[in-house]
A protein has these predicted regions:
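Glycine/tyrosine- and acidic-biased, solvent-exposed loop/turn segments at the edges of beta-strands
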Residues: 1-195
Length: 195
């Protein structure tokens, strides 16, 4: 450890080391509060985490890295609360998911992606709950599920498709429960009777 004090409070750069002597953390303090750049490293010296503190709270962009140095995820903070997009990446660098935050709650369009960049899921969040149309896709881009949410609860139409685009099931949800008549198709049975 290397510490600096001013008026009995941590002030300046704080460094923590692994037993082998390589840097583990480099942190800035001002009047006893985390303030400024923050870095965390692996034993091998690779950057694992970086961000900024402002008067003891996470602020601005934070980055998480894999041991190979590639970006794993990034977050934006305001007053120690997620605010902005949180983005996760595949090792290839392709976006895996994008989550919109407003003052700590998911708000906006949530999207996830397959490793090739094709869409995987898409849904709108309002005040931390799914709201409106939800879509999920197969890896080849074909539609897998279409559903609807109201305040985080399944409400309305539900359609489920196989990877050939054939309808598997269709029905309605009301306050999270299946209601009414549901159509369910079993492609293997249908193909057998068509031969």
């Amino acid at each position: 450890y290397q510490l600096e004090f001013r008026e009995n409070l941590l002030d300046g750069v704080f460094e923590e080391f692994y037993p082998e002597g390589t840097a583990k953390k480099v942190v800035n303090y001002q009047k006893g509060l985390l303030h400024g750049d923050f870095f965390e490293f692996s034993k091998e010296g690779e950057l694992l985490l970086s961000g900024t503190y402002f008067q003891g709270e996470k602020s601005g962009d934070w980055f998480v890295y894999r041991s190979d140095g590639s970006l794993k995820s990034e977050y934006t903070y305001q007053n120690n609360v997620l605010n902005g997009f949180s983005i996760a990446y595949y090792a290839s660098g392709q976006v895996a998911e994008r989550i919109p935050f407003q003052m700590g709650e998911i708000n906006g369009i949530y999207e996830s992606f397959f490793p090739d960049g094709g869409p995987k899921q898409r849904v709108v969040f309002v005040d931390g709950q799914e709201q409106g149309e939800f879509t999920q896709f197969h890896a080849d881009g074909k539609l897998a599920i279409v559903a609807n949410f109201s305040k985080g609860i399944l409400e309305g139409i539900w359609e489920d498709y196989d990877d050939q685009g054939r309808l598997l099931s269709k029905g309605m949800y009301q306050q999270g429960d299946r209601v009414g008549e549901w159509k369910e198709v079993y492609p293997a049975v249908s193909e057998f009777y068509q031969k």
